[in-house]
């Protein structure tokens, strides 16, 4: 397990400084790698089950191999630096590139701000950037719901899971996870084109998020009093509704937060989680929940491994 100072500084750098420019962002580079091999292996939109399964698997293996090699070499180079201040700072800065704490808050808050200003059309356009559903027909309630769903799901994807894999496996663990997560975002959905080609990526993402998503849900339960939530309701939501989404993982944070803040989150035609009116105040408290759950994780990790 790596020193807690690396995780604390990495989250601090990401939360208060933000991500590097796209030209040098590792996750953007990973996305370009995925697209490159997709163009090599899947030059046509036609579907062939066996071919797509094989080439989708090869795409994942090749990209993960490249990411692991690069992250491992970077980690070795940093660890060879004798000056501890430079070594710790550089390691933490690189690690921060695997986290999306600041961007999660900013993207989730944007549609909420438009709702506050009674600009529903801009809110729908804003929330379209963070969810895959059609937002054209959404009302105020469902725009807020989509924003909160995205924030609660991405507590795992963007922050807790990268920190967990970094804690156990260092830079290679964090960036291998981010690579799998990027794969899932790009090709891991059940469209005709990616039904088989993206299957390996989707399964691997489900596996890697299984434990982190449940840890993230528990963090939301424990930290509930700090963001205006209710511990008992959060706990009931976690166990009663956590498995009610199509994803085997995302429901645990969404259901926990929905019940903790007494609000109904709904993706029309797919699921309803929690009960109660969604308000702007509850939406903003959801973003506080992100910060407090991450803070709690870092405190627990520091107590255990400092």
From Swiss-Prot:
<keyword id="KW-0812">Transmembrane</keyword>
<feature type="transmembrane region" description="Helical">
    <location>
        <begin position="54"/>
        <end position="74"/>
    </location>
</feature>
<dbReference type="InterPro" id="IPR004485">
    <property type="entry name" value="Cobalamin_biosynth_CobD/CbiB"/>
</dbReference>
<keyword id="KW-1133">Transmembrane helix</keyword>
<dbReference type="GO" id="GO:0009236">
    <property type="term" value="P:cobalamin biosynthetic process"/>
</dbReference>
<dbReference type="GO" id="GO:0048472">
    <property type="term" value="F:threonine-phosphate decarboxylase activity"/>
</dbReference>
<feature type="transmembrane region" description="Helical">
    <location>
        <begin position="207"/>
        <end position="227"/>
    </location>
</feature>
<feature type="transmembrane region" description="Helical">
    <location>
        <begin position="88"/>
        <end position="108"/>
    </location>
</feature>
<keyword id="KW-1003">Cell membrane</keyword>
<comment type="similarity">
    <text>Belongs to the CobD/CbiB family.</text>
</comment>
<comment type="function">
    <text>Converts cobyric acid to cobinamide by the addition of aminopropanol on the F carboxylic group.</text>
</comment>
<dbReference type="GO" id="GO:0005886">
    <property type="term" value="C:plasma membrane"/>
</dbReference>
<protein>
    <recommendedName>
        <fullName>Probable cobalamin biosynthesis protein CobD</fullName>
    </recommendedName>
</protein>
<feature type="transmembrane region" description="Helical">
    <location>
        <begin position="286"/>
        <end position="306"/>
    </location>
</feature>
<keyword id="KW-0472">Membrane</keyword>
<keyword id="KW-0169">Cobalamin biosynthesis</keyword>
<dbReference type="Pfam" id="PF03186">
    <property type="entry name" value="CobD_Cbib"/>
</dbReference>
<comment type="pathway">
    <text>Cofactor biosynthesis; adenosylcobalamin biosynthesis.</text>
</comment>
<feature type="transmembrane region" description="Helical">
    <location>
        <begin position="155"/>
        <end position="175"/>
    </location>
</feature>
<dbReference type="GO" id="GO:0015420">
    <property type="term" value="F:ABC-type vitamin B12 transporter activity"/>
</dbReference>
């Amino acid at each position: 397990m790596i020193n807690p100072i690396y995780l604390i500084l990495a989250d601090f750098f990401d939360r208060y400084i933000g991500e590097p420019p796209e030209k040098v962002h590792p996750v953007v580079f990973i996305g370009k790698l995925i697209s490159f091999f997709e163009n090599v292996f899947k030059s046509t939109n036609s579907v062939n089950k066996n071919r797509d399964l094989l080439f989708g698997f090869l795409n994942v293996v090749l990209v993960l191999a490249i990411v692991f090699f690069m992250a491992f070499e970077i980690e070795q180079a940093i660890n060879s630096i004798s000056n501890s201040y430079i070594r710790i700072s550089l390691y933490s800065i690189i690690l921060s590139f695997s986290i999306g704490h600041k961007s999660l808050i900013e993207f989730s808050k944007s549609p909420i701000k438009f709702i506050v200003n009674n600009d529903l059309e801009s809110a729908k356009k804003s929330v379209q950037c963070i969810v895959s559903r059609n937002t054209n027909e959404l009302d105020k309630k469902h725009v807020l719901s989509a924003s909160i769903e995205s924030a609660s799901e991405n507590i795992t994807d963007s922050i807790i899971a990268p920190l967990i894999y970094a804690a156990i496996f260092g830079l290679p663990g964090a960036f291998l996870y981010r690579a799998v997560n990027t794969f899932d975002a790009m090709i891991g959905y059940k469209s005709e084109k990616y039904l088989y080609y993206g299957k390996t990526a989707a399964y691997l993402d489900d596996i890697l998020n299984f434990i982190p998503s449940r840890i993230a849900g528990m963090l939301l339960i424990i930290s509930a009093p700090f963001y205006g939530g209710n511990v008992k309701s959060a706990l009931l939501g976690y166990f009663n509704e956590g498995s009610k989404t199509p994803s085997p993982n995302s429901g645990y944070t969404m259901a926990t937060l929905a019940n903790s803040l007494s609000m109904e989150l709904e993706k029309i035609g797919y699921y309803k989680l929690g009960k109660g009116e969604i308000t702007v105040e509850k939406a903003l408290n959801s973003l506080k929940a992100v910060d407090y759950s991450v803070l709690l994780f870092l405190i627990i990790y520091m107590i255990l491994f400092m």
